[in-house]
Structure formats: C-alpha cells, structure tokens
Swiss-Prot record:
Gene Ontology BP terms: tRNA wobble uridine modification
GO molecular function ontology, one term from the record: transferase activity, transferring alkyl or aryl (other than methyl) groups
UniProt name for this protein: tRNA U34 carboxymethyltransferase
Reactions catalysed according to its record: carboxy-S-adenosyl-L-methionine + 5-hydroxyuridine(34) in tRNA = 5-carboxymethoxyuridine(34) in tRNA + S-adenosyl-L-homocysteine + H(+)
Length: 323
C-alpha cells in the first residue's frame, strides 16, 4: 500500500505545514474514489520489490544504485520482472543494481540542458509540476536540494516513483503526490518551481503560469520547459485535432511570445536559456516502452514536420523570477 504519512510528518515541521489544511483530505478522497483499475496490480509490484539500501548511490550524474556485492541472478530477475510490470517507462533512465531501465525519453539530456542555467539548488525546497515518474526529482536531490516534491495525477507514474524510491533505500528527500496543479492552494512556499512538458497541455496557458507563480516564495525561480515554434513575440501555433499524434495540445507559442506571457503574469528577469529540436535519439521506442514514439509522429518524407504537417517538436527552457 502506497501511503503518504511520512510526507505529512515531514511538512508538519517546516514551512509547508499549512498544506496539511487541505492535502490529507484530498489524498483520502483520491484513495477512496479515484484510483485506476490497475492501481492495485501496480502497487503490488512495488510491494513485492525487495528492500535494498544502496552501497553506492549516484544522483548527481545519473540515477544509479549499486550494491556492495552483486545481486544473485534470481534477485535481478525478480526486480526486472516487477519493474517491467510497471511499463511503459517514459522518463528516465534508471540503473538499479544491474537492471537498466532504458526509458522512452532521455530525461538526463534535458537535465543537462537545464542545470547550467539554474540558481544553485543547494538547500532549496522544490516543486516539480507534471513530474512523470520523478526522474528529475532525484536529479534535483543530487544537485543539493533539501526537498523535492513532485505532483502528477498519472497513477502509473506514482507507482514507478515508489518502486524507484524503494530500491534507493526508501529515500525520503523526494516525494510524489497524485495531484494536478489546480488542486494545490497558493502555497507560496517553494524556492524553485519546475514545469517541464506541461504548458502545451493546458487549455489556459496563462492561468497555468499564474498557478506556478502562486507556489513560489518571493524571489523564487521558475523553470519553464515547453514546446515552441519559430517566430516573434506574436507567434502562437494553435493545432487542430492533433499535434504529433497528441490530442491534448492547445497552444504552442514562440519562445519570444512565451517570454512576453511570463512578463505579463508579473515575472521578472525572464530569459530564454535554451532552444533545441527534439531528436529521435532523445525520444524513442525501447524495450521498456514498446509502443509508438517520436519517429512515428514525424512525416516520413520530411522529418522537419509532424505527420499533421506542423513544425516538428522543438523545446525551449525559460528561466524567470517572482518579484
């Protein structure tokens, strides 16, 4: 059974304690009414994983756990089988005692692009909105964060996160809650807020920016990563039914337009830190994610376009500060 009591106890002692006015009731309602039909199967996979304390843990350069002596073939097979019961694995990679989870996305590449532009994360309390399986939460801890909290309503991601946590020695420096940003009160409590790969899924992107701002302390830093198109500050793509086969894509601005949106929402010191085209090496089908991936979403005759004829995915990282 996946429980959240450790997180409640943790925040009861710090500046997030006011979150306890709403959070336990929200989680209790989720446990009663909103669990996915496969949630028990997924949580059982987590339950059956062995409890291991890593002899060597690297969260600075990767998410890697090693034991002092190699695990037996039977132990490795058990871990591998249970983790495969949690497929598809989209965000990673993870290397856990010799079991290498080769995820759809090379999320480590994104982290390498983002990290040089961040304020020092040492001692910070961080919120990662739409955190997926929590890969970047662990990298934030590796970069020195005091506490990394992720929110994502996708319940498979919660189980993947808890599986990795268990194999990292039940590390309590990172936590994932099965919530969306709209369920959070205006906590104004996080030193850094990340929103990566979320904005284009929001029907009201400016509302999302305001919601992110409401989670930051004064002088806090926002890290925003999202799809963009080429163009000036007035350029925004509004796709039709689908973009790269995704139905729920609403607005894809240019990077200059996104900078203007952030300034309109009251952020300051806004800068475009990085823009890059997503490649089929960074997002691809693997044995841990066996369905279609980016190569299937691009025009086979012109890789600069999606199958719908839109510009192929490129992503920008913007950094901003709340005054």
């Amino acid at each position: 059974m996946i429980e959240f009591g450790n997180f409640y106890q943790l925040i009861a002692k710090n500046h997030l304690s006011h979150w306890l006015e709403t959070l336990p009731a929200q989680i209790a309602a989720w446990q009663r009414e909103q669990q996915h039909g496969l949630f028990k199967q997924w949580s059982n996979a987590v339950e059956f994983l062995p409890e291991i304390t890593p002899w060597r843990l690297d969260l600075l350069h990767s998410v890697t756990a090693e034991s002092e002596t190699p695990l037996s073939e039977g132990q490795l097979k058990r871990i591998d089988t249970l983790l495969r019961n949690l497929m598809p694995w989209r965000k990673g990679p993870f290397s856990l005692y010799g079991v290498d989870i080769d995820t759809e996305w090379r999320s480590d590449w994104k982290w390498d692009r983002v990290l040089p532009h961040l304020s020092d994360l040492t001692g910070r309390t961080i919120l990662d909105v739409g955190c997926g399986s929590g890969y970047h939460l662990w990298r934030m801890i590796g970069a020195g964060a005091h506490l990394a909290v992720g929110i994502d309503p996708t319940q498979l991601f919660l189980c993947q996160f808890e599986a990795v946590r268990k194999l990292l020695g039940n590390d309590q420096r990172a936590h994932l809650l099965p919530l969306g940003i709209e369920q959070l009160p205006a906590l104004k409590a996080f030193d850094t807020v990340f929103s990566m790969g979320v904005l284009y899924h929001r029907r009201s992107p400016l509302e999302h920016l305001w919601q992110l701002k409401d989670q930051l302390v004064n002088e806090g830093e926002l890290v925003l990563e999202t799809l963009v198109v080429d163009g000036d500050e007035n350029t925004v793509l509004v796709p039709g039914d689908r973009y790269a086969q995704m139905r729920n894509v609403y607005f894809i601005p240019s990077a200059p337009a996104l900078k203007k949106w952030l300034e309109k929402c009251g952020f300051i010191d806004v800068r475009i830190a990085d823009v890059c085209v997503t490649t089929t090496e960074e997002q691809r089908r693997t044995e841990w994610m066996v369905t279609e991936s980016l190569a299937d979403f691009l025009d086979p005759n012109d890789r600069s376009k999606t199958v719908e004829g839109y510009p192929a995915p490129q992503r920008a990282v913007l950094i901003a500060r709340k005054p």
